[in-house]
Design a protein with these regions (language model features):
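Asp-box/BNR beta-propeller blade signature and adjacent active/binding-site loops
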Residues: 1-159
């Protein structure tokens, strides 16, 4: 990546990945998760603290060309906030609903654990998520293009 240009991956169709979130794995590797127009979230890995990166590939997580965010929690697990919806690859965008939270131990296998918003009115977008000192997750996102919504997530209460 140079001068903020999109990362070009390899595959049957070019992977144009933007807006990365960085995860730090227990073994020291870094992983980025990125939004795409390829109907899935893109990923790339680094074993040298970001000096070099693997080829960008598509994950199994759906993406409708809408923003995502991810965070590595203090216990080493990873959290992803995203719209759990795929568009046809190459289409501009899909409905920005539902807005979901997924968890992963390895950054590869993601399990949806919570739906924050799910309405045909749509437009739950540009999420951001962090883990607070209290261990809870704190998320903000655009709500129906009308306001910013805040949500606190206590993972101990999710089965």
């Amino acid at each position: 990546q140079e001068a903020g240009e999109a990362i070009l991956g390899e595959g049957a169709q070019p992977i144009l990945a933007i807006q990365p979130s960085i995860l730090k794995h227990k073994d020291g590797r870094l992983q980025v998760l990125c939004r795409t127009r390829n109907a899935k979230i893109a990923t790339s890995w680094s074993s040298d603290n970001g000096e070099t990166w693997s080829k960008v590939t598509l994950s199994n997580v759906p993406n409708n060309n809408s923003g995502t965010d991810a965070v590595t929690m203090s216990d080493g697990r990873h959290i992803l906030i995203y719209n759990h919806f795929s568009t046809l690859s190459g289409t501009p965008k899909g409905p920005r609903t539902p807005l979901c939270v997924a968890i992963s131990e390895d950054g590869i296998n993601w399990k949806p654990i919570l739906t924050l918003e799910d309405s045909p009115i749509s437009q739950y977008s540009y999420p951001s998520i962090i883990q607070g000192k209290d261990g809870k997750l704190h998320a903000i996102y655009t709500w129906r293009r009308q306001r910013i919504k805040y949500t606190e997530i206590d993972l101990s209460k999710i089965k």
